[in-house]
Swiss-Prot record:
Record's protein name: ER membrane protein complex subunit 5
Bilayer topology: Multi-pass membrane protein
Source organism phylogeny: Eukaryota, Fungi, Dikarya, Ascomycota, Taphrinomycotina
Any GO BP annotation: protein insertion into ER membrane
Described function: The EMC seems to be required for efficient folding of proteins in the endoplasmic reticulum (ER).
C-alpha cells in the first residue's frame, strides 16, 4: 500500500512539473510571436526556462528510485534474441578483414 502511495506522489510531482514546463514553453512561444525587432527573448522568460529546467532535473533525481547494480552472471545465462549476431563470421572477423584491406591498399 505504501509503495502505491509513493508512486502516486511521484507521478503527481512529475505531472505538475510537466505542466509547468508546458506553461513555460507556451509563454516563450507567445513571446516569440510578439517579439520585437531585436529578436531577443525577455529576461523573465529566460529565467523561467532556466528555473523550471533546474527544478525538473533536481526533482527527478530526488524522487528517482535508487540505482541497482548490474549483475552479469544473472544476464549471461539467459538466452538472448541477439545471439545470432555472434554467429556472423564477418562480424567476428572484422578486425582481420580490416587488416587485409589495409595490406592490399599499401
Amino acid at each position: 500500500m505504501e509503495s502505491s502511495t509513493i508512486n502516486a506522489k511521484k507521478i503527481s510531482v512529475l505531472l505538475t512539473l510537466f505542466s509547468i514546463i508546458g506553461y513555460t514553453a507556451y509563454s516563450a512561444h507567445e513571446s516569440i510571436l510578439e517579439i520585437r525587432q531585436d529578436g531577443k527573448l525577455p529576461l523573465d522568460i529566460k529565467c523561467e526556462v532556466i528555473l523550471v529546467t533546474l527544478l525538473f532535473t533536481f526533482t527527478t533525481v530526488i524522487i528517482a528510485s535508487p540505482l541497482r547494480s548490474i549483475q552479469l552472471n544473472k544476464w549471461s545465462h539467459q538466452r538472448s534474441d541477439l545471439a545470432f549476431l555472434n554467429s556472423r563470421t564477418n562480424f567476428l572477423r572484422i578486425k582481420e578483414l580490416k587488416e587485409k584491406i589495409e595490406k592490399v591498399k599499401n
